[in-house]
Amino acid sequence: MTNKDGAQRRCDIVLLVDEETGARRQDGRFVPDRSSMEEAVLKCLRAHYREAAVVAFHPDIVPTINALRRLDPKIVFNLTEWVDGDRTMDAAIAGVLDMMKLPYTGTGPDGMRLARDKALSKEVVARLGVAVPRHFVIDPGDRVASFGLPYPLIVKPRFGDGSDEINIRSLVRNERDLRRRVRVLRSRVDEPLVCEEFIPGRDLYVALLGNAPQVMQPVELVVGRKGAAAPQFATYRLKNDGAYRTRWRIRWRKKRLDAAATREVNSASRRIFHALKLRDYGRIDYRLTSEGQLVFIEANPNPDLHPHAMGIDLCFAGVKHPDAIQRIVEAARRRTRGR
């Protein structure tokens, strides 16, 4: 990019995305898939900035580094989640941006690793005085046992994201089910597994914006149809299969809490946000029991920023999509000012 006099001009902002989220044209430009989160965010950025470019993070990082050096962006909007399908590499991407001394939106390497670790994050949160499920880790090669925790248990990959590998069979009710589920997951993922006590109640989602974060109104997952086969927690299918949600009359809605519960949710969410080193935006997932106990399940350092996530009953309810995107950018600018 050059000025009228031929001098190099810095790009205002670069949208950094996963290679799998679009296609590269013959002229070398990367174009996000239509109706994708990446396209929606890019549209917001181009409405606000004169120069907004897209860079796809390639598994061979040299082309990515060269593209970023050439554009020399004032800030990077980081929407990456993996490298070549490996979600544990999101921290490495943030590390590359740090090494290049490029300001960027979102959580850094330390926070990514903390939040992605479904065991370590619970240990950190428990020290804050927030309730967490009792749990243990089964490493590859470990013997399989419940270690005294009562059934039922939930079994999930330690570093999974987006409910990867979580389905109705993740809920195990005896040692036979536990062994079977561990065997299946070991054949599918090469990582430790977390087994945690199942907390009866409802899923509660709390989004945060900014670095002295505004806590958005909590949202709960509601299953309208009852029955033995009704989902009791959020699975990959529940999140991604519209017909399945229709069949079980599943919806998300704002959760109305009394003043004391609201104070508890706000306080816990802010403390978790900072303890897990989240930045600019994030989401905390809880279970809310019928007795009103708030139990931390996991933190999401880069929750969905598609416009549907800003819907009237979803986590960023009340904030228009362009405003949320701009607030994230401005939070990152303030945090990195002087770099």
What annotation goes with each model-predicted range?
Residues 260, 279, 288-339:
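C-terminal active-site "lid" helix and adjoining low-complexity regulatory extension at the edge
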Residues 268-274:
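Short, basic/aromatic recognition patches
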